[in-house]
C-alpha cells in the first residue's frame, strides 16, 4: 500500500508523525509513509488533536472529516480524509 490511496469518498493516508517539531509541516515520504511534523507533544492525545486540526486545515475540510483509523497511540497512523476540498502539493505529487 502506498502513502496516499484515493478512495471513493476521499483519501487514505499512511503517516509517520514527528511530535514536538519546530513547526507544523508535511515533510515528504518516509519509507512508504508520509512524514508529518507537528509542534504538539505526544501527551494525553494532544498530538492527535493537533494532527487532525493541521490535516483538516491543509485539505480544507472540517475536523470531523479527518478520521484516525489506525495508530491512535503510535507514530505510525492511517487516516481517512472525507471529500478533501484541496490537495496540498506534497500529497498531489504522490497521487500522480
Curated annotation (Swiss-Prot):
It comes from the Bacteria. InterPro entries: DUF167, YggU-like_sf. GO terms for cellular component: cytoplasm. Pfam families: DUF167 (PF02594). Signal peptide: none annotated. Coiled coil: none annotated. Belongs to the UPF0235 family. PANTHER family: UPF0235 PROTEIN C15ORF40. HAMAP family: UPF0235 (MF_00634). This is UPF0235 protein YE3436.
